[in-house]
């Protein structure tokens, strides 16, 4: 019987795990190691190497060896080898293919299904690319799940019988995530629900390595006069030495870095011989460490809890072995000691294997509930961002809301989909636009267009719009629209906080304009429909106020709009009084029943006129 595995496809290393007898087991690769370097190399004789064998010949084959592919997922990045260009999906598929073969060798059975993990802040394009890589490798990707969630799944199932909050601090080779999860326990069942998540897709151990490389390049130039910053082979040697030095500084206070024959000078070979202390290393990388602080604070704030409510802190990713990282986490959590009972390199793959078991029916004692990291919505009149799904909403989820047209006989509506936290769409990320056509001719406010957002369990977005009158429907899948760099995500959240008051004022002004437009339209229509029932002086006064409001709306003075709106709101009551008075006069004159019927019809018109002043009706109509 074909088996299902859990795979942690990492920036630096990857791991595969499987359930045996309902319990997860990490599978050693063909070389005997439990982690496989995420490196692919193409030899000059046409052989493709993956893992440790590829990494070993990195220096001698630097132009044909590719590492840290994960940082390019979801982009149009390619690398040329001979006459062929390889995408990040193809190269990742090589790594996944090796993990698949190693698992099949260990199990003595075919492996067809897999749960693959991604950073919690991976966007739609990156998730789609990961799924495609699995398919290229011959795997049926059962689910894409977030790395911190997988780690909590692996950690939380064996921890007592009480409901607890678990904080996962995941600093890998290329990405950083922090998530707060709630583990709910019954006697024979566990629910793991993500409360909030935040992160940085461009922060990881590679950045710490690069700081050491930059430092060594500078020191080498100072001591020898040789600049090796553009020497590919020298840079690769420095990168490997930096990675090793970083690891050694996790257990030692200093390390010696010696690279003979790093370059050549007029006087012969130039050697590198440097001592790097932990204190210097932490000085070089302090700003990188500080970048982990804000996502941590955001997660605690958005979950509405205090640090003291956190029961367990789990460190995930090899980079969390750095003492400075451990110290910062302890400081942020009020002195709470991070759990050391899990292997930070393996825990994510173990959680993925557990989820694979759940999806295949091998484990029925756990339910996993994840979240979407950013709000999703559409643009409505006035450029307002109308959110249909708020950030940190549990997925899968589906939300619908009904909107209407802004103009008479409007034949179509353009549905513009946005992602972000600001009040106005111009400040958020445009994911895409599609058009719903074929709307039956009708006055503004009459057609009903239902917009539905659907986020599946993989975090991939689907949007549809349906005209309730004609049944016409249009839909789209966001496959690359939410490709947000970490700068975009950080900027959206930061600006949302900084400009909250400004956004509130602008939104209120937009709401007033919307309400004013609707009021002017409705009163204008009411005057025309009751022209013969209105005294000339009342009609002239109210029409003047309508014209004044229209004139104000044509300008940019928000105060003038509000003043004209208030004036018309007050004077419109005279229309109702006049129409009532006319109806009473007709009844007193003893008109025929037909006339009474007409008066009743007029009364119905009055009701229609009165409700336009209600805020909720205005907002709904103007969307």
Swiss-Prot record:
Function: Acts as a chaperone.
HAMAP family membership: DnaK
Induction and repression of expression: By stress conditions e.g. heat shock.
Modification sites for Phosphothreonine: 175
MF annotations from Gene Ontology: ATP binding; ATP-dependent protein folding chaperone; unfolded protein binding
Identification of the protein by name: Chaperone protein DnaK
UniProt keywords, alphabetically: ATP-binding, Chaperone, Nucleotide-binding, Phosphoprotein, Stress response
SUPFAM superfamilies: Actin-like ATPase domain, Heat shock protein 70kD (HSP70), C-terminal subdomain, Heat shock protein 70kD (HSP70), peptide-binding domain
Domain of life of the organism encoding this protein: Bacteria
Acidic residues composition bias: residue spans: 604-617
Low complexity bias: start-end ranges: 581-596
Region (Disordered): 581-623
Family (UniProt): Belongs to the heat shock protein 70 family.
